[in-house]
Regions:
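Compositionally biased, low-complexity segments enriched in small residues
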Residues: 1-3, 155
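Sec-dependent N-terminal signal peptides
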Residues: 3-16
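Non-catalytic cap/lid and distal C-terminal segments of serine-dependent acyl enzymes
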Residues: 19-261
Length: 261
């Protein structure tokens, strides 16, 4: 079904250009998806811009990143178009094999991604994706499942193995089925088990995790798997917990990394 798109220009005081709020309707997800697009103030459609899909964590929404950092400043400093979709609170950005109303991976690849390419002057050779926590694992999962769509991906405190998630008996059981009976589905939807998809490619990924984060060992295991498969990966671990104060600082490293590719 062709998505319905409504575009609202959010005029920002003191900014030279508007930020766009789009509403996409699709039967692949349970409701309308609101997408916030932040363009460089100097945005000019005559030249293509690299883009970063920025995914929020569990319980968040399309505006969650704006509560941590000034997205307009990032767009201006790095000259990226920043795209913040709504992950429907706890979609984990995947296609549910048990609930046909939760097909976020298909929504992303079949609706969101092509619509953004059609509406904005994007450099299709320099599309990136990253996020925090659920958004970090979602970003890496989408990248590993569809590496041709992105130049690179990042993750900050991502759930690289869904078996380590605190939501195995709640959100993830709704999406993948009862945890005890569907361990194989939890395994197959984990980024760590999708790394083989870029084993023989020149893709270079970036991820980080705080040393006091409950997902620290999970991310260490992801790094070990990257090393085993000889995948180019930059991994940063530093003091920090699973919280906004950490992500507010860590995300800049992602933009620096992407800008140098």
């Amino acid at each position: 079904m062709k998505p319905f798109i409504a575009i609202f220009l959010l005029l920002q005081v003191f900014l030279l250009s508007a930020q766009d709020q789009l509403v996409l309707e699709s039967n692949l997800v349970p409701g309308n998806d609101t997408v916030w697009v932040i363009k460089p103030s100097s945005y000019d459609t005559s030249a293509p811009y690299p883009a970063v899909y920025l995914l929020h964590g569990r319980t968040g929404n399309y505006r969650s990143w704006a509560e941590l950092i000034n997205l307009q400043e990032y767009a201006d400093e790095y000259q990226f178009i920043i795209i913040c979709p709504d992950g429907f609170y706890d979609s984990y950005y995947l296609d549910s094999p048990v609930d046909t109303s939760w097909q976020f991976e298909s929504f992303f690849t079949e609706v969101l991604y092509p619509e953004m390419a059609g509406l904005y002057a994007l450099d299709k050779a320099r599309i990136f994706i990253t996020g925090l926590s659920m958004g970090g694992s979602g970003a890496m999962y989408l990248f590993l499942k569809h590496p041709a769509l992105f130049l690179s991906a990042g993750s900050s405190s991502g759930v690289m193995d869904l078996n380590h998630s605190s939501a195995v008996h709640t959100s993830l059981s709704r999406l993948l089925g009862d945890y005890e009976s569907n361990r194989l589905l939890f395994d197959s939807h984990s980024p760590v088990n999708q790394l083989k998809n870029i084993e023989r490619s020149d893709k270079h990924i970036f991820f980080d995790c705080g040393t006091e984060d409950h997902l620290y060992e999970c991310n260490n295991a992801f790094r070990k798997k990257c090393d085993e498969l000889k995948i180019k990966a930059t991994y940063i671990s530093r003091p920090g917990k699973h919280e906004g104060a950490y992500w507010k600082e860590s995300i800049r490293c992602h933009f620096i990394f992407f800008s140098n590719l």
